[in-house]
Amino acid sequence: MISTRGNWPLVPTMDVVVPHARTMADLLEVLDVIVADDAETRGDFWRAQPWVTLPLSSEVRPESYDALAAEAATALRGIRIGIPRMYINADPDAGTAAEPGIGGPTGQRIETRASVIERWESARRDLESAGATVIEVDFPVVSNYEGDRPGAPTIATRGLVSPEYLRREIVDLSAWGWEDFLQANGDPGLHTLAAVDGATIFPHPEGALPDRYTGFDDDIAEYPEWVRANPGIGFQDMPELADGLRGLEETRRLDLEEWMDEHELDAVVFPAVADVGPADMDVNEASADLGWRNGTWIANGNLTVRHLGIPTVTVPMGLMSDIGMPIGLTFVGRAYDDTALLRLAAGFEAIGAPGERRTPPPRTPAL
């Protein structure tokens, strides 16, 4: 819904603009300004591509985001919410596939910290007290993306998206996106990726432990060479893209939207992360083992959420009682359910004990 034009692309099919704000009220005010139609499509791949039709922002946004705050008091009443068992240590099949995942720790069992579970249980009580029904569910959109259990496919083996497309997307399309951004930006000091030494992109810090991104196809250090070897190539010249993009849309429709309809769910929620990695995980092997676990290395949902165009809103759930780190609750919905999710997130923020979920950082002096 928010134009990505002007943002440095990472993976054009996955990139989104994500506003961060102190409160839902602040966020809604920001959205009233930045959610707008953008006539210029260069720099926003999804609006530039011709194969999947997207609505205009003005067709799916409310007249006023700020007005949603007035609905917070009753937003959760009668709502049916699913909590995936895989994120609350309640799914014995998660992570039991012989070779789970699509790279890194994806597909492995998620071990959610006890203090995160405490915050979730408190949040669940508040949701139910506000009139929501919360049920524990499977989560096929992640299981069928990551192959986390026996019999589950991955995004590459499902048959809706080809392996050839997935490689084209993460290598050719991404390198093209970087190059197009630099050319559009027109910085006289650097206007082409071809002028960059790939070895200087994301260099490994001296003394740091090896990263654990094993299994992924991309090496961003090779992007400059791709640009040098493919002058003048655009995304229209990549034959796998049309079917690949349609396959991503169909995957979301089958594994999330039809599944939500089947369970009569208005939304899905889960803790934003399973744990927080130790600060020394770059140099301490034991800490790295903790920090690179599924659910900890990046947020719960991994690549699935952004790759399939699934909207989410995350709001504070409180501090972990043992380590004092904040934890969020992520609300998930169908494509273009953004407004409904914002309404639910505002409703969640409005309930619970005062100061329970959002507290000033203890090391930060008061203003």
Short names for language-model regions:
Residues 66-70, 110-138, 179, 183-185, ...:
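Acyltransferase
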Residues 129-151, 231-234:
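Short connector loops at secondary-structure junctions
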Residues 12, 28, 154, 177, ...:
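Glycine-rich, small-residue loops and helix-cap segments
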Residues 1-103, 121, 126-128, 133, ...:
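Structural helix-boundary/capping segments
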Residues 92-113, 228-233, 287-293:
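A solvent-exposed, charged loop/short amphipathic helix patch at secondary-structure junctions
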Residues 124, 165, 173-178:
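Phosphate/diphosphate-binding loops
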Residues 144-172, 282-284:
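Charged, often glycine-rich, active-site loop that binds/positions anionic groups
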Residues 14-18, 107-112, 242-246:
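Active-site rim elements
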